[in-house]
């Protein structure tokens, strides 16, 4: 009697159905394994430790990395050399946005600029334009930062503030903001608008100028855990129909993708039940999305 093949390829995780009822090619649990696009299961590759001090708020700035190491904002070179940038940092997570060669950093307690590897406070600039009675302020503290259509956006609680075009040191806080109902956990740009989310729902706001009338679409139940948003080249998603623009992926109760024009898709399907999470992180490399979720 010839061999009978009972397992050809894995469909991945199924955490919603009873393990006794899932298909033969589904997994009820997976620890440190990869499932290839062809359904092959392999052990996940290991990693090398660069330093063993407690760290958080990691950000790649090209030829160096920023991170809070032992409570201090530090610069980590490619060879693992660590130098302290500033020690005026507490336990809050820092979010970063790179515009050209300049890194802008924000948290609920610190805001700064790093240019040519030098730390500067992020303060209000001078308005050198036409005479105006408008009142400009320094950027607010906040939990999220993003860049879109020549403006920097900062989320402080449930409000998204935006800078003047090409003047990232000038914020007209009123009326220069977009209010939401709950604390924002995602803020990410695509070609023709911005994606936002709180812990329950997601929103797409179309248009390039937030100072003008905006159109908002709501996607109920598509909330994000703060920190999980990732920008991905559009040609890497699906059939490549969104080539030329970024799309954003995030993770909450489901794994979602948002693209230009309000394109939305839940890619975790009906068989993956994720735990409740307040915060997390996301990573995209070599065609793979990786999310880490944290509940507290």
Located regions from the model:
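Short acidic-glycine loop/turn motifs at beta-strand connectors
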Residues: 69, 77-79, 107-109, 114-118, ...
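Short, surface-exposed beta-strand-loop junctions and turns on beta-sheet-rich folds
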Residues: 73-74, 80-83, 111-112, 119-121, ...
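Beta-propeller fold detector
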Residues: 83-87, 121-126, 172-175, 213-220, ...
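N-terminal beta-propeller domains
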Residues: 1-81, 131-204, 208-209, 293-296
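Hydrophobic or amphipathic alpha-helical targeting/insertion segments
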Residues: 95-127
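Repeated scaffold domains used in trafficking and secretory/extracellular systems
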Residues: 51-59, 88-101, 129-149, 181-189, ...
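Hydrophobic beta-strand segments that make up the repeating blades of beta-propeller
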Residues: 65, 103-105, 194, 247
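Beta-sheet-dominated scaffold domains
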Residues: 5-10, 182-296
């Amino acid at each position: 009697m010839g061999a009978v093949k009972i397992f050809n390829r894995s469909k991945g995780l199924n955490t919603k159905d009873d393990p006794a009822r899932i298909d033969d090619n589904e997994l009820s649990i997976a620890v440190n394994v990869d499932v290839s696009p062809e359904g092959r299961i392999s052990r996940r590759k290991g990693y090398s430790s660069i330093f063993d001090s407690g760290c958080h708020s990691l950000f790649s700035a090209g030829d160096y990395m920023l991170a809070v190491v032992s409570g201090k904002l530090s610069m980590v070179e490619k060879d693992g050399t660590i130098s302290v940038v500033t020690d005026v940092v507490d336990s809050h997570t820092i979010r970063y946005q790179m515009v050209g060669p300049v890194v802008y950093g924000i948290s609920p307690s610190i805001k700064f600029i790093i240019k040519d590897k030098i730390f500067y406070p992020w303060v209000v600039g001078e308005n050198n334009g036409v005479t105006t009675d408008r009142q400009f302020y320094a950027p607010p503290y906040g939990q999220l930062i993003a860049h879109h259509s020549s403006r920097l956006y900062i989320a402080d609680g449930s409000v998204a503030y935006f800078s003047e075009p090409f003047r990232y040191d000038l914020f007209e806080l009123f009326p220069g903001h977009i209010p939401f109902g709950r604390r924002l956990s995602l803020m990410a740009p695509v070609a023709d608008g911005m994606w936002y989310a709180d812990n329950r729902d997601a929103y797409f706001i179309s248009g390039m100028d937030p100072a003008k009338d905006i159109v908002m679409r709501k996607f109920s139940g598509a909330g994000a855990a703060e920190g999980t948003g990732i920008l991905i080249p559009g040609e890497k998603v699906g059939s490549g129909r969104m080539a030329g623009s970024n799309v954003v992926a995030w993770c909450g109760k489901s794994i979602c993708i948002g693209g230009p024009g309000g394109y939305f898709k839940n890619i975790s399907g009906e068989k993956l039940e994720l735990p409740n999470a307040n915060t997390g992180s996301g990573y995209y490399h070599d065609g793979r999305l990786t999310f880490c979720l944290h509940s507290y």
